């Protein structure tokens, strides 16, 4: 809940609501997740919190976190990776540490929403990671060993690459996709 929502429900000023929520936090009744955002029902889902951190810009969980949740990698990242239309940043909260990365609007999408949580599809998590390898240098330059599920649709990667406006960036992304698919095919036949 937002501080303003608490103020409206209680019929008090935002300042009084903030003081009341801070007192309730000291008593252990609520958790301050981010400035102006509170959880009244215990520890919120870390994937739900992701959208709070980028508000008013939309976001979804992707990259290594989505790869892990979708079963493509066995490693479980400590950091929760998020893509957004907002700026790139790292945010530490009581729920976890978030690494937010900006995508251009034409590449925003390819996620499923359930109970307010937005999670990239397997294909989009792979695409986002390959795409951001160009912009983020070393951070995403090496993908861990990936096990593609039987229902993985490689053509979706190229569909997303087609949406990249800059010809050089599109060419780089397609080359990364081709290398990735060739490498995973070699790994699966070994």
Show which residues each predicted segment covers.
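Short beta-edge/loop segments at beta->alpha junctions of small alpha/beta modules
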Residues: 1-58, 94
């Amino acid at each position: 809940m937002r501080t303003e929502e608490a103020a409206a429900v209680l019929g008090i000023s935002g300042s009084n609501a903030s003081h009341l929520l801070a007192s309730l936090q000291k008593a252990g009744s609520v958790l301050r997740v981010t400035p102006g955002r509170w959880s009244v029902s215990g520890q919120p889902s870390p994937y739900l919190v992701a959208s709070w951190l980028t508000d008013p810009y939309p976001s979804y969980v992707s990259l290594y976190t989505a790869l892990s949740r979708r079963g493509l990698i066995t490693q479980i990242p400590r950091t929760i990776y998020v893509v957004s239309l907002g700026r790139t940043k790292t945010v530490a909260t009581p729920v976890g540490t978030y690494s937010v990365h900006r995508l251009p609007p034409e590449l925003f999408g390819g996620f499923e929403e359930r109970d307010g949580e937005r999670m990239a599809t397997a294909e989009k998590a792979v695409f986002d990671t390959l795409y951001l390898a160009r912009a983020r240098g070393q951070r995403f330059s090496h993908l861990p060993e990936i096990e593609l599920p039987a229902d993985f649709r490689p053509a979706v990667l190229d569909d997303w690459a087609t949406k990249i406006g800059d010809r050089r960036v599109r060419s780089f992304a397609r080359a990364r996709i081709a290398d990735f698919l060739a490498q995973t095919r070699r790994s699966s036949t070994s």
